[in-house]
Amino acid sequence: MAKNRHLFTSESVSDGHPDKIADQISDAILDAIISKDPDARVACETTVTTGLVLVAGEITTSVYVDIPKIVRDTIKEIGYTRAKYGFDAETCAVLTAIDEQSPDIAQGVDEALESRSGSEIDAAIEAIGAGDQGLMFGFATDETEELMPLPIFLAHGLARKLTELRKTNKLDYLRPDAKTQVTVEYDEFNQPVRIDTIVVSTQHHPDITQEQIAKDLHTHLFPEVIDASFLDENTKYFINPTGRFVIGGPLGDAGLTGRKIIVDTYGGYARHGGGAFSGKDPTKVDRSGAYAARYVAKNIVAAGLAKKVEVQVAYAIGVARPVSISIDTYGTSDYSEQELIDGVNELFDLRPAGIIHMLDLRRPIYRQTAAFGHFGRSDLDLPWERTDKAEALKKLIVK
């Protein structure tokens, strides 16, 4: 590798990975509830293991949803439809342990500190306080058209295409569980120049050979996802490097909601506040705050105000306004952090109810985000991925 070059690696997983099964079940339940009761409070956690799904958490709503049916339908859609996979939508046990939201938390969310103290005029927006304290990050970079880091973008692309090859029976020996990983080489100007390593581990029928899997992935997977200009004779491929991946899914490993937070975001390329997304209604700033931070970051880059930017927002439980906003452009902007923050404060309402209104989050849009990443999804119409404020932001800041 040339001097001053460096490598960066990100991974993704398929929708059949145990942790992603759990995420998708949690978000499918959230969508079912929020479609009937947009103001519901949902914190839904799922764990999956051999032959068993446990759904637990705090849900406050006046509507009924058939949780066992949602669980089974989600598992079936993912592709676990045979008992020999060790996990089957029809025969797995489904247990539920659901409580209402704590009244101590509800008090602060129902009526924010600013509203309770009479310190705010904007009652409708100030009425909702943050559902918890915490810090969230949003990130954008001009490495890709989607304004995502290239390693995670390619890792997601491989995982999504692998799932498509399985579900369309193009490669009918594939089974639902899979992981992908891409290592990108960057030059001295921090621009991606080549792919150094690709790792794919995919569950498969026991009778297929590893040689056949490798041949098929080189024919049907890699050319469909990765630009050939990034590949060379030194690119390394590791396909099922253990030599066998027959036992997978919840039979191989237990899964839990919220254990793939780096896969869900930027593949480790940007910092993470630690809060997971799936199963949480939009009053939970772990989710809505991270979406808003991505929205801000993406519009900053789309406006040409920076080539790369990380936005941090932080909240106190029961308080509507963020306690802090931080913007780091890594030296790629001609404008100061304060100039950018002033423009963001002018255009983006980062109070919980403001985010919910700005991004129209009280809708059943979450199940589709629970696999293959929440950001950079050109295959979905996600409100936080829009760059509709870029021009207005540019006019505010560029004098």
Swiss-Prot record:
GO terms for molecular function: ATP binding; magnesium ion binding; methionine adenosyltransferase activity. Binds 2 divalent ions per subunit. Its cofactor is Mg(2+); K(+). L-methionine binds at residues 58, 101, 253, 284. It is an enzyme of class 2 (transferase). One of its GO terms (cellular component) is cytoplasm. Mg(2+) binds at residue 19. Pfam families: S-AdoMet_synt_C, S-AdoMet_synt_M, S-AdoMet_synt_N. It catalyses: L-methionine + ATP + H2O = S-adenosyl-L-methionine + phosphate + diphosphate. It comes from the Bacteria. InterPro entries: ADOMET_SYNTHASE_CS, S-AdoMet_synt_C, S-AdoMet_synt_central, S-AdoMet_synt_N, S-AdoMet_synthetase, S-AdoMet_synthetase_sfam. The keyword Magnesium applies. GO terms for biological process: one-carbon metabolic process; S-adenosylmethionine biosynthetic process. It is found in: Cytoplasm. ATP binds at residues 17, 177-179, 244-245, 253, 259-260, 276, 280. Its EC number is 2.5.1.6. K(+) binds at residue 45. Pathway: Amino-acid biosynthesis; S-adenosyl-L-methionine biosynthesis; S-adenosyl-L-methionine from L-methionine: step 1/1. Keywords: ATP-binding, Cytoplasm, Magnesium, Metal-binding, Nucleotide-binding, One-carbon metabolism, Potassium, Transferase. The keyword Cytoplasm applies. Belongs to the AdoMet synthase family. Catalyzes the formation of S-adenosylmethionine (AdoMet) from methionine and ATP. The overall synthetic reaction is composed of two sequential steps, AdoMet formation and the subsequent tripolyphosphate hydrolysis which occurs prior to release of AdoMet from the enzyme. Homotetramer; dimer of dimers. This is S-adenosylmethionine synthase. The lineage of its organism: Bacteria, Bacillati, Bacillota, Bacilli, Bacillales.
